[in-house]
């Protein structure tokens, strides 16, 4: 079966938001729990939804902590977000070759749009599915299924690319092929444990992988 659709996670995959996310968590947690959290403590929080993360810390303060996080994240977005090499060129080439391309993210739409505009990727994507569009987040298959439905694509024709186990397992649950990115903050070995079909050392590795898959 030929691959004609590529779905991407956003944070840590297409754009480097690691410092923004870590700083947003530290700001929020130090506001409510001064001097209790360090950088290494918040690394496991990258990937799950904000609601899932904060509800494990204090269910009574979930909504206000989410508000605090998002306000800081919004205010410091452009100064802390960076690009990854070859991402722009690769997505542009996929679009040029006729692939359907979409984003499946656990982020809110407002900050998704900020990141896409900042990185100039906003012109390429046919579909963007955010946490605002679904009831269940990755690794539940719903977000990927919604993106595939909107793109009129079948799971077996699609590849999911991401930096977190939620992306890889989400792709597996939805029936797509999966590609993990080695630049994940959690380390290459962390993602290899979830057995993605492919491992990318840079985003442009996607192009020969897809070419080979569609040739066989």
Swiss-Prot record:
It catalyses: diphosphate + H2O = 2 phosphate + H(+). Transmembrane segments: none annotated. One of its GO terms (cellular component) is cytosol. It comes from the Bacteria. CDD domains: HAD_PPase (cd02616). One of its GO terms (biological process) is DNA repair. InterPro entries: HAD-like_hydrolase_sf, HAD-like_sf, HAD-SF_hydro_IA, HAD-SF_hydro_IIIA, HAD_2, HAD_sf, PGP-like_dom2, Pyrophosphatase_Ppax. Gene3D superfamilies: HAD superfamily/HAD-like, Putative phosphatase, domain 2. It is an enzyme of class 3 (hydrolase). GO terms for molecular function: inorganic diphosphate phosphatase activity; magnesium ion binding; phosphoglycolate phosphatase activity. Its cofactor is Mg(2+). Its EC number is 3.6.1.1. Keywords: Hydrolase, Magnesium. The active site is at 9 (nucleophile). Belongs to the HAD-like hydrolase superfamily. PpaX family. HAMAP family: Pyrophosphat_PpaX (MF_01250). PANTHER family: PHOSPHOGLYCOLATE PHOSPHATASE (PTHR43434), PYROPHOSPHATASE PPAX (PTHR43434:SF26). Hydrolyzes pyrophosphate formed during P-Ser-HPr dephosphorylation by HPrK/P. Might play a role in controlling the intracellular pyrophosphate pool. This is Pyrophosphatase PpaX. It comes from Bacillus cereus (strain ATCC 14579 / DSM 31 / CCUG 7414 / JCM 2152 / NBRC 15305 / NCIMB 9373 / NCTC 2599 / NRRL B-3711). The lineage of its organism: Bacteria, Bacillati, Bacillota, Bacilli, Bacillales. The gene is ppaX.
């Amino acid at each position: 079966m030929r691959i004609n659709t590529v779905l991407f996670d956003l944070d840590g995959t297409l754009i480097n938001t690691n410092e923004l996310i870590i700083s947003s968590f530290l700001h929020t947690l130090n506001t409510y729990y001064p001097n209790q959290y360090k950088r290494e403590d918040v690394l496991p929080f990258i990937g799950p939804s904000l609601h899932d993360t904060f509800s494990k810390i204090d269910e009574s303060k979930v909504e206000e902590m989410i508000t605090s996080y998002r306000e800081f994240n919004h205010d410091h977005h452009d100064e802390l977000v960076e690009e990854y090499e070859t991402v722009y060129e690769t997505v542009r080439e996929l679009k040029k070759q006729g692939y359907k391309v979409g984003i499946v993210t656990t982020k809110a739409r407002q900050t998704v749009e900020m990141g896409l505009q900042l990185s100039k990727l906003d012109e390429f994507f046919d579909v963007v599915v955010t946490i605002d569009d679904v009831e269940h987040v990755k690794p539940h298959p719903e977000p990927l299924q919604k993106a595939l439905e909107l793109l009129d694509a079948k799971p077996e024709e699609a590849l999911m690319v991401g930096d977190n186990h939620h992306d890889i397992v989400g792709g597996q649950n939805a029936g797509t092929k999966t590609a993990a990115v080695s630049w994940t903050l959690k380390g290459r070995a962390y993602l290899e444990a979830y057995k993605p079909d492919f491992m990318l050392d840079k985003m442009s590795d996607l192009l020969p992988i897809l070419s080979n898959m569609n040739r066989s």
